A protein has these predicted regions:
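Active-site cofactor/cluster-binding pocket
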Residues: 1-190
Length: 190
Protein backbone atom coordinates (compact mmCIF):
# COMPACT_ATOMS: atom_id res chain seq x y z
CA UNK A 1 0.00 0.00 0.00
CA UNK A 2 1.27 3.44 -0.90
CA UNK A 3 -0.61 6.67 -0.24
CA UNK A 4 0.67 9.88 -1.83
CA UNK A 5 -0.89 12.99 -0.29
CA UNK A 6 -0.65 16.74 -0.86
CA UNK A 7 -1.96 19.05 1.88
CA UNK A 8 -2.16 22.69 0.80
CA UNK A 9 -3.44 25.98 2.18
CA UNK A 10 -2.34 29.21 3.81
CA UNK A 11 0.53 29.34 6.28
CA UNK A 12 -0.92 29.33 9.78
CA UNK A 13 -3.67 26.82 8.95
CA UNK A 14 -1.64 23.91 10.29
CA UNK A 15 -0.83 22.44 6.88
CA UNK A 16 2.71 21.39 7.81
CA UNK A 17 1.61 20.14 11.24
CA UNK A 18 -1.06 17.96 9.68
CA UNK A 19 1.55 16.43 7.39
CA UNK A 20 4.00 15.93 10.23
CA UNK A 21 1.39 14.15 12.34
CA UNK A 22 0.57 11.82 9.43
CA UNK A 23 4.28 11.16 8.92
CA UNK A 24 4.88 10.34 12.61
CA UNK A 25 1.80 8.09 12.56
CA UNK A 26 3.18 6.18 9.58
CA UNK A 27 6.56 5.77 11.27
CA UNK A 28 4.83 4.26 14.32
CA UNK A 29 3.21 1.72 11.99
CA UNK A 30 6.64 0.76 10.61
CA UNK A 31 5.90 2.28 7.22
CA UNK A 32 8.30 4.04 4.90
CA UNK A 33 7.57 7.78 5.15
CA UNK A 34 8.41 10.94 3.26
CA UNK A 35 7.47 14.45 4.49
CA UNK A 36 8.34 17.25 2.06
CA UNK A 37 7.21 20.79 3.02
CA UNK A 38 7.07 23.77 0.68
CA UNK A 39 6.21 27.31 1.69
CA UNK A 40 6.80 30.94 0.85
CA UNK A 41 8.81 33.44 2.89
CA UNK A 42 5.76 34.64 4.86
CA UNK A 43 5.27 33.32 8.39
CA UNK A 44 1.47 33.46 8.10
CA UNK A 45 -0.86 34.12 5.21
CA UNK A 46 1.42 32.88 2.43
CA UNK A 47 0.79 29.57 0.74
CA UNK A 48 2.16 26.36 2.18
CA UNK A 49 1.94 22.74 1.16
CA UNK A 50 3.39 19.45 2.22
CA UNK A 51 3.70 16.17 0.39
CA UNK A 52 3.39 13.08 2.57
CA UNK A 53 4.02 9.58 1.29
CA UNK A 54 3.24 6.51 3.40
CA UNK A 55 4.21 3.14 1.99
CA UNK A 56 4.96 -0.42 2.96
CA UNK A 57 7.64 -0.39 0.25
CA UNK A 58 10.67 1.83 -0.28
CA UNK A 59 9.86 5.32 -1.54
CA UNK A 60 11.79 6.05 -4.71
CA UNK A 61 11.32 9.84 -4.69
CA UNK A 62 9.55 12.42 -2.52
CA UNK A 63 8.88 14.58 -5.59
CA UNK A 64 5.45 14.00 -7.08
CA UNK A 65 3.32 15.54 -9.81
CA UNK A 66 0.14 13.56 -9.12
CA UNK A 67 -1.39 12.43 -5.83
CA UNK A 68 -3.79 9.82 -4.49
CA UNK A 69 -5.30 12.42 -2.16
CA UNK A 70 -5.33 16.23 -2.06
CA UNK A 71 -6.42 18.07 1.08
CA UNK A 72 -7.18 21.64 0.01
CA UNK A 73 -7.68 24.54 2.42
CA UNK A 74 -7.76 27.64 0.16
CA UNK A 75 -8.68 28.76 -3.35
CA UNK A 76 -5.09 29.15 -4.59
CA UNK A 77 -4.38 25.56 -3.63
CA UNK A 78 -7.61 24.37 -5.26
CA UNK A 79 -6.59 26.12 -8.48
CA UNK A 80 -3.13 24.56 -8.35
CA UNK A 81 -3.75 21.01 -7.10
CA UNK A 82 -7.25 19.88 -8.17
CA UNK A 83 -5.86 18.76 -11.52
CA UNK A 84 -3.02 16.89 -9.75
CA UNK A 85 -5.25 14.24 -8.17
CA UNK A 86 -4.97 10.87 -9.91
CA UNK A 87 -8.16 9.63 -11.61
CA UNK A 88 -10.00 7.59 -8.99
CA UNK A 89 -8.30 9.60 -6.24
CA UNK A 90 -9.74 11.76 -3.47
CA UNK A 91 -9.97 15.53 -2.99
CA UNK A 92 -11.00 16.78 0.46
CA UNK A 93 -11.59 20.47 1.04
CA UNK A 94 -12.95 23.05 3.43
CA UNK A 95 -15.47 25.17 1.47
CA UNK A 96 -14.75 28.30 3.54
CA UNK A 97 -13.20 30.84 1.18
CA UNK A 98 -13.56 28.58 -1.85
CA UNK A 99 -15.20 30.47 -4.72
CA UNK A 100 -14.53 27.98 -7.52
CA UNK A 101 -15.53 24.55 -6.22
CA UNK A 102 -13.95 21.43 -7.73
CA UNK A 103 -15.42 20.26 -11.02
CA UNK A 104 -13.78 16.90 -11.75
CA UNK A 105 -16.01 13.88 -12.11
CA UNK A 106 -13.23 11.26 -12.22
CA UNK A 107 -12.30 11.65 -8.53
CA UNK A 108 -14.20 11.45 -5.23
CA UNK A 109 -14.69 14.89 -3.70
CA UNK A 110 -15.51 15.51 -0.03
CA UNK A 111 -16.20 18.60 2.06
CA UNK A 112 -15.40 19.06 5.72
CA UNK A 113 -16.31 22.43 7.24
CA UNK A 114 -13.28 22.70 9.49
CA UNK A 115 -13.50 26.46 9.98
CA UNK A 116 -17.15 26.37 11.02
CA UNK A 117 -16.70 23.37 13.30
CA UNK A 118 -13.58 24.82 14.95
CA UNK A 119 -15.50 28.04 15.66
CA UNK A 120 -18.31 25.98 17.19
CA UNK A 121 -15.73 24.20 19.36
CA UNK A 122 -14.46 27.59 20.54
CA UNK A 123 -10.90 27.17 19.27
CA UNK A 124 -10.00 27.94 15.65
CA UNK A 125 -6.58 26.34 16.11
CA UNK A 126 -8.13 22.85 15.94
CA UNK A 127 -9.26 23.52 12.35
CA UNK A 128 -6.50 21.33 10.91
CA UNK A 129 -7.32 18.44 13.26
CA UNK A 130 -10.96 18.55 12.15
CA UNK A 131 -9.85 18.33 8.52
CA UNK A 132 -7.40 15.54 9.41
CA UNK A 133 -10.26 13.64 11.05
CA UNK A 134 -12.29 13.95 7.86
CA UNK A 135 -9.36 12.59 5.87
CA UNK A 136 -8.93 9.65 8.26
CA UNK A 137 -12.62 8.76 7.90
CA UNK A 138 -12.24 8.53 4.11
CA UNK A 139 -8.69 7.11 4.04
CA UNK A 140 -8.04 5.23 7.33
CA UNK A 141 -4.38 4.68 6.47
CA UNK A 142 -3.11 5.22 10.03
CA UNK A 143 -4.58 4.17 13.36
CA UNK A 144 -6.11 6.86 15.56
CA UNK A 145 -3.87 5.81 18.47
CA UNK A 146 -0.83 6.48 16.29
CA UNK A 147 -2.25 9.88 15.28
CA UNK A 148 -2.51 10.81 18.97
CA UNK A 149 1.08 9.65 19.49
CA UNK A 150 2.04 11.69 16.43
CA UNK A 151 0.40 14.71 18.06
CA UNK A 152 2.50 14.16 21.19
CA UNK A 153 5.67 14.06 19.08
CA UNK A 154 4.84 17.14 17.04
CA UNK A 155 3.43 19.36 19.81
CA UNK A 156 5.86 20.90 22.29
CA UNK A 157 5.38 19.35 25.73
CA UNK A 158 3.96 22.59 27.13
CA UNK A 159 0.95 22.09 24.79
CA UNK A 160 0.27 18.45 25.63
CA UNK A 161 -2.69 19.61 27.73
CA UNK A 162 -4.39 20.37 24.36
CA UNK A 163 -4.19 16.76 23.14
CA UNK A 164 -7.70 15.84 24.42
CA UNK A 165 -9.13 18.87 22.56
CA UNK A 166 -7.27 17.85 19.40
CA UNK A 167 -8.56 14.27 19.73
CA UNK A 168 -12.10 15.64 20.07
CA UNK A 169 -11.52 17.76 16.93
CA UNK A 170 -10.32 14.71 14.96
CA UNK A 171 -13.46 12.83 16.02
CA UNK A 172 -15.65 15.79 15.02
CA UNK A 173 -14.03 15.80 11.57
CA UNK A 174 -14.66 12.06 11.20
CA UNK A 175 -18.34 12.68 11.97
CA UNK A 176 -18.75 15.70 9.67
CA UNK A 177 -17.37 14.90 6.23
CA UNK A 178 -19.70 14.97 3.24
CA UNK A 179 -19.52 13.60 -0.28
CA UNK A 180 -19.66 16.49 -2.78
CA UNK A 181 -21.63 15.85 -5.96
CA UNK A 182 -20.22 17.94 -8.82
CA UNK A 183 -23.30 17.57 -11.03
CA UNK A 184 -25.86 19.05 -8.66
CA UNK A 185 -23.55 20.35 -5.92
CA UNK A 186 -25.33 18.47 -3.16
CA UNK A 187 -23.48 16.99 -0.25
CA UNK A 188 -24.37 13.73 1.41
CA UNK A 189 -23.40 12.91 4.99
CA UNK A 190 -21.33 9.74 5.27
Amino acid sequence: MTEEIIIAGFGGQGVLSMGKILAYSGIMQDEEVSWMPSYGPEMRGGTANVTVILSDERISSPYLKVYDTAIILNQQSMDKFEKSVKPGGVLIYDPNGIVMHPTRTDIDIYQVEGNRLATEMGNKKVFNMIVLGGFLKIRPIVKLDNVIEGLKKSLPERYHNLIPLNKKAITKGMQNIFLYNVENQLTNHL
